């Protein structure tokens, strides 16, 4: 069993919000991350990036010491730390759910005050519905252009159309809270996970419930479509990952044990690899078929539970939140390199991402104008989940450690080796 030894807590960089964070989401086209807070505030932050000017100046001086540099495995490049660029307050209670639209032109938020809202590219609230649900809203997910999905604490899921500025679908799916929602990539099907132990499959064309599984004793807390839409994976209260084969809902096709506590949040890294956040405070890498706990990315201090993780647009950073009011950023490019090379030894080059100029733009969200493909496809069961399968697969072969220095942050180039852990119990205890 492989362990990504280089992905440890000292690779993190963090920004501190003004209150405890309930939800985060990376911008789909630009280097921002949005956070919904317990006091109803929404904050927008930049993500860590290279300071190219510092890189250029340091390269000149380093050329004079090429002999010593070649014998050393460490060189430095300044990093621009995250900074808050926008604060909004349009909910009276906690902002539990937040997501950018698919194009990045706007932001959707949901609150325990039962309201939903849409924020435009300039940070202005352009649409707000009080009493959007009869219960506090627990999850919001983006849909096709101009739409989004919301789920509440009573098991109701709604679809909202910004063009009509109203709900166009409402289904009572569960007897407890809707924990998570995922989709096939042409949005003909949605699958929900609920605190009553069920998952529900929705036909979005016909706007009706197709199937609800039997109730498990475990809460279903997070959900993904994997293997090009042929597998549904849920994270549970007990820590096991439940796996269904698409269309065979009467029983599980497989199960992955190993998490000692509940799996609150999951993201798809690729069709075979998931990242999980658990209540034991650790972010893990999990392989699917073969089913393995591959390693860990890091953890928050004091064993705080991981409440949410999110993947950046270029898949270079994972953002995570816990109960410490911080967004932590974890560099995962080493994981991409290790998966691509299948090598025991990996050398990493320069980061080379982000302009790091810190410019403030009038429109913080301004995304691409291209509409997503909404073509219908009856073969929905083979489609992949959401937009992560379309992400740029560029491999920078890089490993970054963010270390706080005297007012600046530095990158250290390193060589990371994968080690084999023979004892499964050791992984369970230490990963």
Listing of model-derived features with the role each one plays in the protein:
Residues 24-30, 98-105, 110, 140-146, ...:
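Loop/turn segments within WD40 beta-propeller blades
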Residues 20, 29, 84, 91-94, ...:
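WD40/WD-repeat beta-propeller blade-loop signature
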Residues 48-50, 120-124, 162-165, 204-207, ...:
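Short loop/turn segments that connect beta-strands within beta-propeller blades
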Residues 13-40:
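Beta-strand-rich domains and repeat architectures in extracellular enzymes and scaffolds
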Residues 11-16, 52-56, 76-90, 126-132, ...:
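Short C-terminal beta-strands that terminate individual repeats in beta-propeller domains
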Residues 19-22, 39-44, 93-96, 105, ...:
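Short coil/turn segments within WD40 beta-propeller repeats
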């Amino acid at each position: 069993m492989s362990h990504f030894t280089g992905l440890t807590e000292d690779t993190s960089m963090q920004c501190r919000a003004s209150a405890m964070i309930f939800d985060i989401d990376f911008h789909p086209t630009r280097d921002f991350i949005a956070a919904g807070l317990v006091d109803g505030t929404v904050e927008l932050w930049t993500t860590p990036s290279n300071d190219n000017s510092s890189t250029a100046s340091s390269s000149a001086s380093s050329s004079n010491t090429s002999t010593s540099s070649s014998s050393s495995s460490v060189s430095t490049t300044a990093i621009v730390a995250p900074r808050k660029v926008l604060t909004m307050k349009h909910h009276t209670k906690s902002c539990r759910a937040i997501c950018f639209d698919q194009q990045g032109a706007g932001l959707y938020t949901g609150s325990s005050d039962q309201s939903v809202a849409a924020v435009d590219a300039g940070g202005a609230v352009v649409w707000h519905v009080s009493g959007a649900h009869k219960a506090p809203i627990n999850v919001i997910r983006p849909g096709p252009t101009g739409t989004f999905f919301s789920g509440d604490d009573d098991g109701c899921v709604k679809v909202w159309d910004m063009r009509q500025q109203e709900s166009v679908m409402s289904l009572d799916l569960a007897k407890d809270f809707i924990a998570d929602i995922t989709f096939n990539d042409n949005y003909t099907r949605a699958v929900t996970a609920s605190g009553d132990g069920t998952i529900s499959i929705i036909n979005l064309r016909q706007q009706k419930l197709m199937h609800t599984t039997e109730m498990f004793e475990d809460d279903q807390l997070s959900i993904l479509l994997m293997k090009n839409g042929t597998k549904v994976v849920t994270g549970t209260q007990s820590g096991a990952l439940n796996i269904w084969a698409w269309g065979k809902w009467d029983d599980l096709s497989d199960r992955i044990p190993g998490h000692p506590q509940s799996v609150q949040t999951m993201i798809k890294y690729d069709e075979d690899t998931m990242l999980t956040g658990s209540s034991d405070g650790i972010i893990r890498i999990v392989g699917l078929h073969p089913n393995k706990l591959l390693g860990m990315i890091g953890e928050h201090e004091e064993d705080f539970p991981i409440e949410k993780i999110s993947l950046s647009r270029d898949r270079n950073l994972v953002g995570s939140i816990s109960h410490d009011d911080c967004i932590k950023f974890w560099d995962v490019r080493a994981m991409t390199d290790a998966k691509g090379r299948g090598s025991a030894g990996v050398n990493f080059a320069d980061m080379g991402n982000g302009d790091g100029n810190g410019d403030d733009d009038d429109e913080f969200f301004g995304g691409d104008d291209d509409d997503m493909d909404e073509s219908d496809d009856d073969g929905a069961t083979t489609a992949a989940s959401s937009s992560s399968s379309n992400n740029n697969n560029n491999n920078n072969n890089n490993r970054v450690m963010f270390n706080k220095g005297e007012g600046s942050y530095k990158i250290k180039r390193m060589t990371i080796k994968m080690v084999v852990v023979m004892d499964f119990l050791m992984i369970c205890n230490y990963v």
